[in-house]
Amino acid sequence: MKGSVMFKVRSRALSPVAALALLAAAGCAGTAGAGATAPGSGASGALEKTTLNVAVVPAVDSAGFFVALHDGLFTREGLTIRYTPAVSSDTVINQQVAGAYDITGGNYVSYIQHVANDHQPLRIIAEGSLMEPGSQAIYTMPRSKIRSLAQLKGHLLGINAPGNINYLLAAAVLTQNGVNLRQVRFPAQPIPFPAMAGELAAGKIDAAAMPEPFATAAEEQYGAVELADLNQGAAENFPILGYVATTSWVREHPNTLKAFLAALEQGQEIADTSRTAVEQAMETLSGPQDGQVPPIVAAVMALDSYPIGVDKIRLQRVPDVMYEFGLLRSPFNIGQMLGS
């Protein structure tokens, strides 16, 4: 159980964009119509687009976005958000490049692979989450004979998809604890996070690497037991999720982007300091497929931290660790996804 995991309250001043947005929204809320200048962002011109198609991972990694959506922060900026849960990162990224989505929120590993391997024109516009203790871990069942990471040798460790961030985090922690990755079996096919606990309980996999809220749900429903926290060593406080647009979309929608970021930054700040806000936002989503979390899970699930802006040095950790574990053929400079 994660009843002992407490949300970490951080005292931090509002970022300049968020502060400006809050002040402007207080004086101008409710005055914007379609095509109007964003009331909260102080945009210098009309919004190029007021209805955005946004695909985001339905997990606690996206809490800042869900808070902004729940609290009407995008609406205050003159934006209507059409939200789609991003179940498969590869599918969503390909659809985004094809124009189906304006902005997506997903794991950095998948985005970097698409840029490094397929030269997709993707730009990181904001950070979404950093891993915190308890927010991702490896689990077994209560009667499992596996009691340590070393005992995973020869066993099947369930991950969301081959070569994605779920694999990378597990690989980093296993290696740090002296486990040869060649001695651990991984599924050849993806296992959706909502199905992973059931696979574990049915004995189809011997252990499972799961993020929140799926981890706490597995504990509540099946009695799953934490074997190892993934927040350690090379993966400690690891950047997990970011928000991305194509380079052409960023260039063609500067005012819309500014409005989106103003709302998102407010959501990030609230999520980072108010556990109650995160619980309420995720409890009221339309269904489990969209990220809805029942109150019994929301009350005890561990949360990430939710940074503001983009930190190049911090994000460079992701491709560096990817290269170390063979997910990139050569070193990758994250600056090419930041416009620098």
What kind of region is each of these model predictions?
Residues 154, 220, 339:
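Phosphate-coordinating loops and pocket residues in cytosolic domains that bind phosphorylated ligands
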Residues 109, 118, 186-187, 192-283:
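Pocket-lining segment of extracytoplasmic ligand-binding domains
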Residues 59, 86-90, 105, 164-165, ...:
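Soluble non-cytosolic domains of exported or imported proteins
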Residues 35-183, 188-190, 206-212, 227, ...:
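Short, glycine-/small- and polar/acidic-enriched structural segments
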Residues 1-49:
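Short, low-complexity disordered leader/linker segments with a strong preference
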Residues 250-327:
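Secondary-structure end/capping motifs
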Residues 320-340:
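Conserved C-terminal helix/tail region of periplasmic/extracytoplasmic solute-binding proteins
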